[in-house]
Structure formats: structure tokens, C-alpha cells
A protein has these predicted regions:
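S-adenosylmethionine
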Residues: 1-436
């Protein structure tokens, strides 16, 4: 167990040094080349779990320590161990003993008796005082919800009827959702294919299936053949909202990693241009298209500039703009702790440059779908309202997010295009604009 604790502690330490978990975890794993697949899997679970509930765990440790711990690696190890004591099924005394042993494995001056004694004492005090600690924190919102206070306050103001459920949903394990290419296989046939391989699944939309138990992608039937893709149900709403028709000229701006580009090409025979500012990210888009046996014109360029554009207008534009990603926090648990309140305004400013730039490239009568994976109003309807005030030739079109009684979870809770995160989907925002 101590190997997994050490890996997770290193990853958590990196995150609090400013690195996102997607990069931090592989880097931490590379330090332990002899780790078994089971140890690596456990380390990933501990990393995600610790960051998911850091607000709660950190509040407990604050009460247990006389003063802040200056050694950040020891503190990260304590965070991981307290997460295990709170949320893991492992035996409590095994967790404590393994954490103490982990200290001795650190190749640092901290691997001394004082550090081992500190870790042992804090963890055992936590076990003894757990009930009293819980009582003391019952009014501490950061501890209760495991979000920064500014985030909690913002949702309270913007979603007075939904803020608690949104916070709680963000702390759940995300579902694994598939998008079935119904041009290649029907939903019925694909569900039967899953059943033959003893993979339980529930259809929740016209092309969406949630797996009861997440699978490695290489074990998903038809994935390598392009029959299915992994994509959140909320993200699957983009392509249908674009009102696609064959032969239209379509732009997917800020396209990486390419899930929506693939869905657009599966939906209609269009002339597809996919834009991203990062060439390395476009390589991932190309790999995804190769798997799906689809083609698009991939362009390295800045969506806030027209310098890359040939001047021929697009009939449809998907503007999936950079954002705080506050609506997909259950998939990216580090976002809660890496984001700062000031970042919201920074993203709003970036979006405000992209929208007018893309609008110039839209044909008259064309449609632009503005998309974020955020739940913050400033980035969403607030951004759209400002754009409409400044552009008389823009109209926001009403739309219905798809409901079909054949599927048990298809009815989506949304407020003016804002998906309220639920067990079935993440918190995306959609606004459909037409050029008059």
C-alpha cells in the first residue's frame, strides 16, 4: 500500500505546485517503475480521491496540527492517508502503518524519526477524535462540500435552487458514456454486442450509452474500429444543435481533442475544418479521425484572429471556447484547487476576443453554436448577452434539448441552455446564434 500512497502523494504535491493532474500522475508513476498495475491503479484512485475531497481533508488536518506543516511532501502524504481513513475501505491501522513506512522511503531529510512520529501521531489522533472533528466542521462549507469558498458563493448566487446538487454532483465519480456511430451500427445491435461480452449498459439518448462499470477503451467492443467513441452525453448535444446538412462548410474552432469534430462528421457529409492553436493537440485530433475513418482539414491557428482564414465564410461554426471547465470538475478534480476567482474574468476576456473573430467568418444566415464546459454565468449567457448587444446582426435562437421517453435519463435539466450537472451528463452551456 505504501507504494501507492507515495505515488499519490507525489502527484498531489505536484498539483499544489501548479501542475494539472493529467500531467502530474504520469510523472509520479514514472518515479516508481517497479510498481505493479494494481499499485498504479490504486495510486490513481488515491490521487483523484484526495483532490476530490481536499477541502474536507485539509480542514481536518488544520485542526489536528498546531501549526502549518512546512514540508509539503509530508503534508501531501497526510492528505492521502486521511482520504483513505475517510473514504477508502482499507483497514485503518494498515493505512496508518503504511503511511509511516512511506515516510521512511522518502529520499529526503524528512525521512527521520520526527517525521515518522508526526505522521503516526496525527493519523492516530484523527482516528481517536474523528467524531469531535466532524462536529466542529459542521458549519464549515469548504469542509462540507470540498470546494473553495469563492466557488461555493458564486454558485449560491447564480443557482439558488441548484447550487447544493451541483456541488454534490461535482464530487461524484463521472460516468463512462459512449457515443454510438449509428451510421455503422444501430443502438439495439450495439447494446446486444455489449451484452454478449457481459458489459452492462443503459441507453440514455439517441446515440448515448452509459456503462455501468467503466472499461479500458481497448476493451470496449468496436472502439478501435470507430463504431463508438467515449464522450459525455452533454457534449453529444453539440452536433445535433448545429442543424447540419450535407455539403455545408463547417468550422470546429478550438477543436482538440476532436470528439465534437468526429460527431459532426458522423452526422452529415460536410466540408469540415478543425482549428486549434496547438499543433500537438491537432495530432491527437488526427489520431481520433483515423480511428473513425473520417477526414477533416486540420488547421493550426488562433480562433481570436482571422489571419489563418482564406476569406470563404462558413455555414456553421462550433465555438467550443476556452473556459474555467467548472462544469466538468468531477472529471478534472484538480480544477477546483488550481483555479482562482480571478481566472473567471481572464477566461471571459479571452472568450470576448474569440466570438467577434469567428463571427466575421460566418456566412449570412449561418449559425454559430457557442459552447463552454463551465457553469459560471459570466462565461455563458452573460458573455452571449454582451455579444448580442454589440452585434445587431446576431440573434439567439431558442432550442429544445432533446427528450425521448424511450430513454430513462434523457430529460435534461437546463436553464436557458445551461445544463445542470447530473449523474447522466456534465455541466455544458449552449447558445445558438444566427447571423441575420
Amino acid at each position: 500500500m505504501y507504494i501507492s500512497q507515495l505515488i499519490a502523494a507525489d502527484a498531489v504535491h505536484q498539483v499544489f505546485s501548479g501542475r494539472n493532474l493529467t500531467l502530474a500522475l504520469p510523472a509520479a508513476l514514472s518515479l516508481f517503475p517497479a510498481a505493479t498495475p494494481q499499485q498504479k491503479g490504486a495510486a490513481a484512485d488515491l490521487s483523484y480521491g484526495t483532490l476530490r475531497f481536499y477541502g474536507e481533508i485539509g480542514a481536518y488536518l488544520t485542526q489536528l496540527m498546531e501549526k502549518p506543516l512546512t514540508d509539503e511532501r509530508i503534508y501531501a502524504l497526510l492528505l492521502v492517508a486521511v482520504y483513505q481513513l475517510l473514504h477508502d475501505k482499507a483497514d485503518s491501522f494498515t493505512v496508518v502503518n503504511q503511511a509511516v513506512h512511506a515516510v521512511s522511503q522518502l529520499k529526503r531529510p524528512t525521512a527521520k524519526s520526527w517525521a515518522k512520529g508526526l505522521v503516526n501521531g496525527i493519523l492516530r489522533n484523527f482516528l481517536r477524535q474523528k467524531d469531535q472533528l466532524i462536529h466542529k466542521l459542521k458549519m464549515n462549507e469548504v469542509a462540507i462540500y470540498s470546494y473553495p469558498q469563492w466557488w461555493i458563493n458564486k454558485l449560491k448566487i447564480q443557482y439558488p435552487d441548484h447550487w447544493q446538487s451541483m456541488l454534490e454532483t461535482g464530487n461524484q465519480h463521472p460516468p463512462m458514456t459512449l457515443r454510438v456511430n449509428t451510421q455503422k451500427i444501430s443502438m439495439t445491435d450495439y447494446l446486444q454486442l455489449l451484452a454478449r461480452q457481459d458489459i452492462e449498459a443503459t441507453p440514455i439518448g439517441a446515440q448515448a450509452i452509459i456503462l455501468t462499470k467503466p472499461q479500458a477503451v481497448e476493451k470496449i467492443p468496436g472502439f478501435n474500429d470507430g463504431i463508438v467513441s467515449v464522450q459525455d452525453y452533454g457534449a453529444q448535444l453539440a452536433a445535433p444543435l448545429l442543424d447540419l446538412k450535407d455539403k455545408l462548410k463547417v468550422l470546429d474552432a478550438c477543436c482538440a481533442p476532436g470528439g465534437k469534430t468526429g460527431h459532426i462528421l458522423e452526422s452529415a457529409n460536410v466540408a469540415m475544418t478543425s482549428l486549434d492553436s496547438d499543433e500537438s493537440r491537432l495530432q491527437r485530433v488526427q489520431s481520433n479521425l483515423d480511428r473513425l475513418s473520417l477526414e477533416a482539414n486540420l488547421v493550426v491557428g488562433d480562433a481570436s484572429s482571422t489571419s489563418w482564414w482564406d476569406g470563404v465564410p462558413f455555414d456553421r461554426i462550433l465555438a467550443d471556447v476556452p473556459c474555467t471547465a467548472s462544469g466538468i470538475v468531477r472529471r478534472h478534480v484538480d480544477i477546483k484547487w488550481l483555479r482562482r476567482e480571478a481566472d473567471v474574468a481572464s477566461f471571459v476576456a479571452q472568450q470576448a476576443k474569440i466570438l467577434p473573430s469567428l463571427w466575421q467568418m460566418l456566412a449570412k444566415g449561418g449559425k454559430l453554436l457557442y459552447v463552454t464546459c463551465s457553469v459560471f454565468y459570466e462565461e455563458n449567457q452573460g458573455q452571449v448577452d454582451k455579444f448580442l448587444q454589440q452585434n445587431a446582426d446576431a440573434t439567439q435562437l431558442p432550442f429544445a434539448l432533446f427528450t425521448n421517453d424511450h430513454y430513462s435519463q434523457t430529460n435534461i435539466t437546463h436553464i436557458n441552455g445551461q445544463l445542470i450537472p447530473s449523474t447522466a451528463h456534465d455541466g455544458f452551456f449552449y447558445a445558438l446564434l444566427q447571423k441575420n
